[in-house]
Amino acid sequence: MSKEVNNDGYRLAHTMIRVRDLEASFNFYCKTLGMKILRKTDYPDGKFTNAFIGYGLETESPCLELTHNWDQKENYDKGNGWGHICIETRDVYKACEDLSKLGVKITRPPGPMKHGTRVIAF
């Protein structure tokens, strides 16, 4: 087992996902889920855009980094190691009801997690 590191000052800053359609991603994360665009930078020489979105200040809360490679035409493969991004809410049942009304597909209705009691939905 490795030794512990002095993690004073460490924090989870962001997770990055690649998106094929940046505007559609903004629409979903910002308009539907209520996140804010914290910063967006185009890199013409590299032909990509990075956008950071979240619910709070980037310096205080974890956020999502959306990377849009301009030449990407096909959907990305999720791979077999990807799990999910958790967005917590006070009332998962109401959140799923509201999201369904907006056309969001709920793939797993709210209910207790397998082998547990915490209520989750996807």
Predicted regions: what they are:
Residues 1-9, 14, 38-42, 52, ...:
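Vicinal oxygen chelate
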